[in-house]
Amino acid sequence: YYNNMRKKLINLFMMTCVIAGGFTQTSFAQQAKSSNLTQFVNPRIGTGGHGHVFLGANVPFGYVQLGPTEPSRGWDWCSGYHHSDSVLIGFGHQHLSGTGIGDLGDVAFLPVTDANQKEILFSHANENVRPGYYAVKLQQPNVWVELTATQRAGFQRYTFGADAQQAQLVLDLKQGIGWDAAKDYNVDKITSTTMAGHRFSKGWANDQKAFFFAEFSQPVTVKPLGTGRWLIVAADVTKPLLVKTGMSAVSSENAQLNLQKEIPGWDFRQVVADADEAWNKELAKVNIETNDSVSRRIFYTAMYHSMTAPSVFSDVNGQYRGADGKVHDGNFTNYTTLSLWDTYRAAHPLMTMIHTDMLPDMASTFINIYRQQGQLPVWHLMGNETNCMVGNPGIPVLADMVLKGYVKDKEGAYEALKQSALREDRGLGLLKKYGYLPHDLEKTKETVAKGLEYALADACVAKVARMLGKKADAKYFEKRSKSYSKYFDKETGFMRGI
């Protein structure tokens, strides 16, 4: 079995390399023949083991990831969901996927039998999931829960069983995932069919601001329960209760604008169909020719997972919350969830082949983050720099976009590249002073990992400098990029700290 699977994965890898190396973006689209590629996606892959993968409803690169949240039981619950568990505490509107740290889980709804209920048992056998759609049949209360999403809004449909006495939900604004800790939260405005509020938290993202505007398909009464929870009771239990929730990092007014623009009506099935179409459009950019159904499923599932992030981080009116914490008016789509140490080697180069329409805005995002925080993003989450992982991974991503011709403001991009490489923090001061990172002077003792990453980033800066005719800079960074060789130990044949 092991050799069989190993052979399949090697063949799939080789097939991917041939595709990536042999076609332009146009031919990627021309090669796609199936109009229903979402049938080959299995969103459950990666939800067990150490996969940390999000399971729920979202669209490609969406700000909203609406899905089930389980209690945080340790490292393997970073996404808020793990296949080994069978307890739900809510359906939250924002989740991470594939990360090594847990956060988010914002604005969670939970159907309940009474106001004191805080969790529900469920069975994976009763789940139905595909790209853009998640559903689960619950027993206590007896309700069929369905979720779908757009870029900036979530859509829930609760169909209660014939034996249900009331259609009740609890909105939990205190609940979060992993490191997340709610600091300030409230429902600021309530009408018979709407709620608006905010949730500010501190976690992996040091200062996250989430605003929401929720609209109900029928009149509801809302009662505060304390500790960040509100009980919502619908007028008619015999009718499905639909909830549309717009999200924003700027204001609840913007959250309402996002909702009105993206889900103006109440046609749940149409929003599900639109999400499926959005996924098919992106998946159709690559067609693989194989009779191996396992390889096909692995490939399209991996491609699907590659589009959970980066996430849109600006509203339909162009406003976004910047890295300086201020609200900015942008004429571009701003992005966040930039896990760059993980993605600069493969996911971002893939974007330069199949998501070229996103690249000008991605470059603008990087340049504006530099202008607002003084350095290119390292690991950016909800407008916050986490500085997670080593190196300067924002440099190769932006440099690649410049070198491939997707950046209009080349001088602005080069300033961001150069100044990010010339900082003093994160060991860069030692690199400038000694030409390498001395193990005894670098407090994290991660000198080899950092040093190799910095050498690669310096080579990228040098290439852009050379292209722009900045000969002195090119020479300086080319020399600095050779620092990797200083860590090589000829006796052992390995890189070692010095």
What are these regions (language model features)?
Residues 30-396, 400-452, 456, 460-486, ...:
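Accessory carbohydrate-recognition regions in carbohydrate-active enzymes
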